[in-house]
Amino acid sequence: MTRRYLFTSESVTEGHPDKICDQISDTILDALLSQDPYSRVAAEVVVNTGLVLITGEITSKAQVNYVDLARQKIAEIGYTDSNNGFSANSCAVLVALDEQSPDISQGVTKAQERREQLSDDELDHIGAGDQGLMFGFACNETPELMPMPISLAHRIARRLAAVRKTGELPYLRPDGKTQVSVIYEDGKPVGIDTILISTQHTETLGQITDNAAIQKTIKDALWQAVVTPSFGDIEIKPDNNTKFLVNPTGKFVIGGPQGDSGLTGRKIIVDTYGGYSRHGGGAFSGKDPTKVDRSAAYACRHVAKNIVAAGLADKCEVQVSYAIGVARPVSIMIETFGTGKVSEEKLLEFVKEHFELRPAGIIQAYNLRHIPQERGRFYQDVAAYGHFGRTDLDLPWEKTDKVALLKDAFSQPAIVAG
């Protein structure tokens, strides 16, 4: 009997209050690592009407102006009009930072393996910055090997921001959210049930002042300029049965930090797989790569994506866990949900041999300390629209560079990954 169900994921635009915070946190991280690649950073940001608070723990030789960094990022996002209750030039920016605890620092600087002379391997030098568990996931539902609901939600959110920034839809404002419900049959996406867009907009649209007319104008424009282009290379598209909801409260004029406060790390499902895969609970933004919440989640995605790209599974989830101050993972788990072409035990053996999951090894493999300096900016660009499946960015953990090894090891034809 065919099982038919809906699965829903959401995304938010860069102007969403929580995403403002994520981006400021990662802008600070970029600036610090660009000057001092060994900076220890845990930058947290809070925003509210007319207010930005930067807090957390930072130990670095870098000299940066946190207030200027915050204002520059806020302006880049699009908050430049004080009449909207939040503006780069008029908001207050408060800074309250401490240094990293020496009790934590000693375990990161010299891992247990080094302290107790258990290993002289250079990659055993750095200990995990905290205990915890991280997940990575991939599936063959989209060209970028991501679940279709979150992939579509991100595409629509990015397009929503693009038509605002280019002036194609000049009445849009920075805050916005998207949501897509995909129809599945026996685990495969077969249709689009509902698309939801909530987008901040001006009080009037030129000569149009009636709210019903405003909402109809926005809805019609979003379908043509945002939704339709977002499905360009996706085989499954909206049809006559697809429900399309826009600003279902009736209007969305008050938005951004004037409408809701924001906080770094509150959009962890948006940042990852839209709820399709499990999540270890740790946020990414504002954290330097010794924090395994971030770096190990990137590594797990790399493992899972290569396994799926190699044709060894339709879906793959990887879990890794750590103890604070210890370099080597406490555990590694691989789950292919019955779609694997080889056993999870064999895949695990391969992963342990060919993928580096110690913090120092992850940092080295993806160049996580030096990449902001080399590219001019880096982490702030993944702080909105997802950290995975980004076809618009060159992300080291998205490379399918282990496919040939996997294919040779298990004699499977590889699939083409975006």
UniProtKB/Swiss-Prot annotation:
Q: How is the cofactor bound?
A: Binds 2 divalent ions per subunit. Binds 1 potassium ion per subunit.
Q: Does the keyword Oxidoreductase apply?
A: no
> What is any Pfam family matched here?
S-AdoMet_synt_M
Task: Give the UniProt subcellular location, in the record's own words.
Answer: Cytoplasm
Q: What SUPFAM superfamilies does UniProt report for this protein, alphabetically?
A: S-adenosylmethionine synthetase
Q: Which parts of the sequence bind ATP? A: 16, 175-177, 251-252, 260, 266-267, 283, 287
The chemistry this enzyme catalyses reads:
L-methionine + ATP + H2O = S-adenosyl-L-methionine + phosphate + diphosphate
Superkingdom of the organism of origin: Bacteria
GO cellular component terms listed in the entry, alphabetical order: cytoplasm
Which residues does the record give as K(+) binding sites? 44
Mention one GO biological process in which this protein takes part, according to its record. one-carbon metabolic process
Q: Give the keywords, sorted.
A: ATP-binding, Cytoplasm, Magnesium, Metal-binding, Nucleotide-binding, One-carbon metabolism, Potassium, Transferase
Instruction: Give binding positions for L-methionine.
Output: 57, 100, 260, 291
> What start-end ranges are recorded for coiled-coil regions in this protein?
none
Similarity comment text for this entry: Belongs to the AdoMet synthase family.
- Subunit description: Homotetramer; dimer of dimers.
Q: Which NCBIfam families match?
A: metK
Query: Its biological function?
Result: Catalyzes the formation of S-adenosylmethionine (AdoMet) from methionine and ATP. The overall synthetic reaction is composed of two sequential steps, AdoMet formation and the subsequent tripolyphosphate hydrolysis which occurs prior to release of AdoMet from the enzyme.
Name by which UniProt lists this protein: S-adenosylmethionine synthase
Protein's organism = Gloeothece citriformis (strain PCC 7424) (Cyanothece sp. (strain PCC 7424))
